[in-house]
């Protein structure tokens, strides 16, 4: 039985949405047990509307929340915050992994102090899985865990993501690119130039050079490494572009009776494309580099987003990804 700690507090839509997602997800997975962390009264009220088998969950009651307006200093001030208690369950090995949609800065800071980083990892990075045109997934990191990074950080991201792609996504021949403003070797700031030189030297990394942001969704590169500031801008630009494009397509095909008839013929194709590039189906990001399986979902997560993050968390647990990353970094096998 796999155990996941779910911080149900702190998201924009509240605990009811998180509990509804948990209720639906656990019915699809007989090998899963959840620890629901948060305000006990809220959780019990939500469970009345979205029941879960009593043998498949327990509640860890907390009295505090670090919401989106909170500060990283709250990780010291609010010892009984749900996000703190959830991470402590991972540290104490009472669960196999955790997820939250709470305050990102508090999550990153608390993970650093409570769990710590793997050997030789200075800064953990957020890594989502992004859909692409080749019906595969692209890994992009860091997408916002850090505002500044060093070449050593990006090298470690490439190594860890390569292990993740091999073990979780089952592709041992992943290509790795460096996000930059051009494909030429000389492009970029000193960070990109130094990182490029070091990536070229790695024998176990299939480095293909610089990648521009317009190529992120093409699927031509499996793993794209970048600093957290640039990565966050890139991620949100991709999500926003996909959302606007799908909205505009829907608007156009429903603007007249003739177009609506034509759309009926292509309905399945439109649905497939919409599902592929809907970020809610890929809403989670693992905090790669800490001593535990820790996922962050969007603060605006709805039921579908939470279920996607639960699925990603469970996949990482089943593939024992943190232990494999730790061993891979030590042995330099990937």
UniProtKB/Swiss-Prot annotation:
Entry's EC annotation: 2.3.1.274
GO cellular component: cytoplasm
Gene3D superfamilies: Isopropylmalate Dehydrogenase
GO biological process, one term: phospholipid biosynthetic process
Recorded GO MF terms: phosphate:acyl-[acyl carrier protein] acyltransferase activity
Xref: InterPro entries: FA_synthesis, Phospholipid_synth_PlsX-like
Keyword Cell wall biogenesis/degradation: no
Reaction(s) catalysed by this chain's protein: a fatty acyl-[ACP] + phosphate = an acyl phosphate + holo-[ACP]
Pathway(s) this gene product operates in, as recorded in its UniProt entry: Lipid metabolism; phospholipid metabolism
Presence of keyword Lipid biosynthesis: yes
Keywords annotated in UniProt: Cytoplasm, Lipid biosynthesis, Lipid metabolism, Phospholipid biosynthesis, Phospholipid metabolism, Transferase
Location relative to the cell: Cytoplasm
Family: Belongs to the PlsX family.
HAMAP family: PlsX
Quaternary structure annotation from Swiss-Prot or TrEMBL: Homodimer. Probably interacts with PlsY.
Role this protein plays: Catalyzes the reversible formation of acyl-phosphate (acyl-PO(4)) from acyl-[acyl-carrier-protein] (acyl-ACP). This enzyme utilizes acyl-ACP as fatty acyl donor, but not acyl-CoA.
Protein name: Phosphate acyltransferase
Naturally occurring in which organism (per UniProt): Mycoplasma capricolum subsp. capricolum (strain California kid / ATCC 27343 / NCTC 10154)
């Amino acid at each position: 039985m796999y155990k996941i700690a779910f911080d149900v507090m702190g998201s924009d839509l509240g605990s009811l949405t998180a509990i509804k997602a948990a209720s639906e997800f656990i019915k699809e997975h007989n090998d899963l047990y959840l620890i629901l962390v948060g305000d006990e009264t809220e959780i019990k009220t939500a469970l009345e509307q979205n029941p879960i088998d009593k043998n498949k969950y327990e509640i860890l009651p907390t009295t505090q929340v670090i919401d989106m307006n909170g500060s990283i200093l709250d990780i010291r001030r609010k010892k009984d915050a749900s996000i703190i208690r959830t991470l402590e369950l991972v540290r104490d090995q009472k669960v196999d992994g955790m997820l939250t949609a709470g305050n990102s800065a508090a999550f990153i800071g608390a993970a650093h102090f409570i769990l710590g980083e793997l050997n030789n990892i200075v800064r953990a990075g957020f890594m989502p899985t992004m859909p692409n045109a080749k019906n595969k997934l692209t890994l992009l990191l860091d997408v916002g865990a850090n505002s500044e990074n060093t070449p050593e950080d990006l090298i470690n991201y490439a190594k860890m993501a390569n292990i993740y792609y091999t073990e979780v996504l089952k592709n041992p021949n992943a290509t790795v690119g460096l996000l930059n403003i051009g494909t030429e070797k000389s492009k970029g700031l000193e960070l990109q130039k130094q990182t490029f030189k070091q990536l070229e030297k790695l024998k176990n990394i299939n480095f293909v050079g610089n990648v521009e942001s317009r190529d992120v969704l093409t699927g031509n590169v499996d793993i794209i490494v970048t600093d957290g500031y640039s990565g966050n801008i890139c991620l949100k630009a991709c999500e926003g572009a996909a959302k606007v494009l799908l909205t505009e397509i829907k608007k156009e095909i429903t603007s007249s009776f003739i177009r609506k008839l034509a759309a009926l013929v292509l309905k399945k194709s439109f649905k497939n494309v919409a599902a592929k590039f809907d970020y809610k189906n890929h809403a989670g990001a693992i905090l790669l580099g800490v001593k535990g399986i820790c996922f962050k979902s969007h603060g605006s997560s709805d039921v579908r987003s939470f279920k996607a993050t639960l699925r990603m968390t469970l996949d990482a647990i089943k593939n024992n990804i943190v232990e494999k990353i730790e061993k891979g970094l030590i042995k330099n096998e990937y």
